Every structure is written in structure tokens, then in C-alpha cells.
């Protein structure tokens, strides 16, 4: 059933010419070098420190590792992160 719903959203997105991140409820991540990251379509902050940001996603979590991380702006579905970004990892729900 989950696959059918996902497939239906993909088809609807194609017909309506909607961006895939909106249709599939996945994050859109924009990086400027290794110094800045803009993340859209998250569901909340689970953990933040100067070395790690952990965000809740519809289908799991997004983990950003780095040094001297700072949240410059945060909105209900958007985060602007600055610092030395070292890595990004997706954890899918089982």
C-alpha cells in the first residue's frame, strides 16, 4: 500500500509539474561549499550541538556532522545551518 501511494504521488507530481521534494515529502538540501546548508521539508529538530544537527524527516532522520555549527535561522519546515560541515547522513525508518 505504501508503494502504491508513493507511485501515485510521483505520477501526480509529473502531471501537475510539481517538484519531487514536495510530492515525495523528502528534504531539499542546498549547500554552499562546506560552510552553509539550507534544509527544507524537515519535521523538527531532534538534537543540536556545535558538532551535530539531527532533524526529523517524514521517512526518518537527517544527521549533519561538523564543527562550530550554528543555526542562523529556523522556521517550521526550514533550517539555515552554518559552520564547517563535515558530513550528511540519512537514516530511514525501518
Positions of PLM-derived features:
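N-terminal intrinsically disordered, cationic/polar leader segments
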Residues: 2-94
Amino acid at each position: 500500500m505504501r508503494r502504491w501511494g508513493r507511485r501515485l504521488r510521483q505520477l501526480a507530481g509529473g502531471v501537475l509539474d510539481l517538484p519531487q521534494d514536495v510530492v515525495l515529502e523528502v528534504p531539499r538540501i542546498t549547500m554552499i561549499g562546506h560552510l552553509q546548508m539550507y534544509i527544507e521539508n524537515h519535521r523538527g529538530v531532534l538534537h543540536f550541538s556545535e558538532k551535530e544537527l539531527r532533524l526529523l524527516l517524514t521517512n526518518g532522520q537527517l544527521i549533519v556532522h561538523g564543527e562550530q555549527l550554528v543555526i542562523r535561522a529556523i522556521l517550521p519546515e526550514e533550517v539555515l545551518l552554518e559552520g564547517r560541515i563535515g558530513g550528511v547522513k540519512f537514516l530511514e525508518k525501518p
